[in-house]
Amino acid sequence: MMHSAEYRHTETWPYHISAGGVIYRHQQGQLEVVVLYRNRPNGRHYHLPKGTLHHDETLEDDARREVLEESGIRAEIKGYLGAFTDDFMKDGVHLNKTTHYFAMIPLENTGKHDAEHDGVEWLEFDEARKLLESSEPMKKEYIILDRLRDFLD
């Protein structure tokens, strides 16, 4: 049974639900997307903004909230890009995590990202895809960028 305000795994409820987004824009004829990064001893690790669904939220509400909290960008959802489900072990517990992603456009940049990340960058699409694939290949977020490109075509 789950007793948290979030859809976060527990020892007895091994499921985790998250949502996030790909914030995109066209600058000087180039498609750009937002990526977050954390500085690690072996270099920067890039990923897309996302976070855990709260019980009183829709997936869309979660995506908008997490994108704003993590990137500092208030964004509007333009479409659904699908989800990934991942099974893994954490602290000896088998977990199932599903993360939903949305295509989003920026409305306002507050300039305040969360303390969990070292930075937020707008990158040209191909560069962002390459960085997502090379720094966090197991997360497969580069595939979400491919879905964004298909969505926009």
Locate predicted features.
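Short, well-ordered beta-strand micro-motif
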Residues: 23, 37, 101-105, 124
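Acidic, metal-coordinating catalytic segment for phosphate/diphosphate chemistry
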Residues: 1-28
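Nudix hydrolase/Nudix homology domain
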Residues: 43-46, 111-153
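Short helix-loop capping/hinge motifs at secondary-structure junctions, enriched
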Residues: 29-30, 109-112
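Conserved Nudix-box catalytic region and its N-terminal flanking loop in Nudix hydrolases
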Residues: 30-73
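Active-site segment of metal-dependent pyrophosphate-handling enzymes
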Residues: 68, 72-109
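A generic structural motif
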Residues: 24-26, 38-39, 87-89
